[in-house]
Every structure is written in structure tokens, then in C-alpha cells.
Amino acid sequence: MTNRYFKQLLLAEIGEEGQKRLNGSSAVIAGCGGLGTVIANNLVRSGVGRVIIVDRDFIELDNLHRQILFDEDDIRKGLPKAVAAAEKLRRIDSDITIEPVVADLTAGNIEQIIKGADIVLDGTDNFETRFLINEACVKLGIPWIYAGVVATYGMVFSIIPGETPCLQCFIRELPGPDESPTCDTVGVLGTAVNIIASVEVTEGLKILMGRQDSLIRKLIYIDAWQGTWSAYEIKKDDKRCPVCDERQFAFLEKGK
């Protein structure tokens, strides 16, 4: 075991066995923007052995205040986010397998991309993609972590098919375009992005190490500006969920 992880190995919560599990695990990151770049950075530095980054966008100047893997040179090169991120991450740890996928996640490709992964982490900025991820992960039995951040606050919730409520257990309908604030309408605090993504990865590492007993298992809500942290119990109600109870995969089916 390389001494790269020496300080992490000292943690009772991880240790040598936990590190071996991380080194042998595979993660998919959906989106390589504010959340996604922090997620990727933390996964690679933690020693997750294979990281797949899915994003079709190119880097723009207004990304740089929060998307930590990118710089002005990447903009001059005209690189896609997934490719630029992969180049940076390989320089951080050349032993990690980094696979950039320059594409949107769609009903036509998502199952092929995430098949065989141990976890999917949410770095997206829209609920249509999240509903798609939720359906694909429930269908294939892959844990995933929902996360979102806007303005100064964000939330994280770990979803383990067959054990926890899924996303559509508590968000039944796709929110309308004007129902929720977005980073384009109200902005976003870079430090809030870092905090939410770091909590998301921490929960993800627990899953990858088989430490589900340590999962918070609540919807975590953090406001970085106010300095507040809350956790809300999410329970399945009496109404059966169309996805995890009825196994109806409307978003997967409509795009095929």
C-alpha cells in the first residue's frame, strides 16, 4: 500500500481494509461543474480506483470561481470539462483510472455508463437528469447520492435501492422550470459548493467501504452563509412509489 494514504489509513473509520475497498471501487460522477469537480478531486485523492466523469459541456470563464479543477489555460485550449478534469486528476494520482465521457446522460446511454459501478454521485443541475439517474440506479441496484446547491445552501441524501426511500419517494413530480431557484437566477457561493460536495463524497466513501452503518440516512441541509446544518427524516408514505415500489421507469422508457 503506497504511503500516499498514510494519514487516511490512520483513521479508525477507514484503516487498511477501508483503503483497500476504496482502491478497488468504481464511481460515476454525473456532471463536472461546481459539485462534480469537487467530487472528482476528493474521490481521486481518497484513492477510489476508477472514476468515470460524464459531462458534455466546455469550460467558460464564469465557471472558474467554483469549478476547482479548471483554469484559464483550459479555456484557451477549448477542452471539454470531462477531458480537462481527467488530465488534472491523472497528474494528482497516476494510479487511478480516470474515464472522461463527453456526453449528456440520457435514457439511451445511462445504463451502459453506470453498469458495474459501485456508486453514482450527483453533480447535475437539473431534476430531469436526477429522475433519470434515480430510475437507472433503482433498476440496476446501484447506490447513488442526490445533491444540489444554489445560492448559499444545499442538500445531500444517500439512496440505496431496497434499503432507503428513492428520490421519487419524496419528490413525486418533476419540478417546473420556474418552481425552484437556480444558479443562473440567484447565483451560487463557491464555498457552499465545496461544503455540499465534500459531505456528498464523505457519505459516498462510507458506501464504498461497506460502512452503511455510518450513513446519516437523512436529508442533510446546510446553509454555508448562515452556518446552519439540519437533517430531516425521509420516510416512505402510504402511497406506493412508482419507481422503487412499482418499478415503473418512465424517464428511462420515454427516451428510448
Regions found by a protein language model. Give the residues of each.
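Adenine nucleotide-associated cytosolic modules
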Residues: 1-256
